[in-house]
Amino acid sequence: MRFSVFLVGRSTAPEQDRFVMQSLIDHARQAEDRGFDAVFMPDHHFTGYAPMSSDPFVFAAYLAGQLKKIHFGMSVTTVPLHHPVRFAERVNLLD
């Protein structure tokens, strides 16, 4: 059986972004340390203020450089809102 963690973070103002992002990084590290297999993130647009959700592929690429064993996935990806070439490049970053 495999277990995953779903990361989602919201802030009420840009001043909170650093704290929110650092908390998500810490959660991902703890998930890996505790033996979870994957971290999933949302790819939602225009749903309130969630700094990581605007481009979770970049955030996942950052986490991939920090973590060694865990896999990454997007829980929802709104493909029509992405340019096809840019989307392929973002996904390729994680390969």
What are these regions (language model features)?
Residues 1-66, 71:
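N-terminal beta1-alpha1-beta2 module of alpha/beta enzyme domains
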Residues 18-23, 80-93:
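Glycine-rich anion/phosphate-binding loops
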Residues 57-60, 90-95:
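A short, terminal or domain-edge coil/loop segment
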Residues 73-81:
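Conserved strand-turn element in the central/C-terminal portion of the radical SAM core barrel
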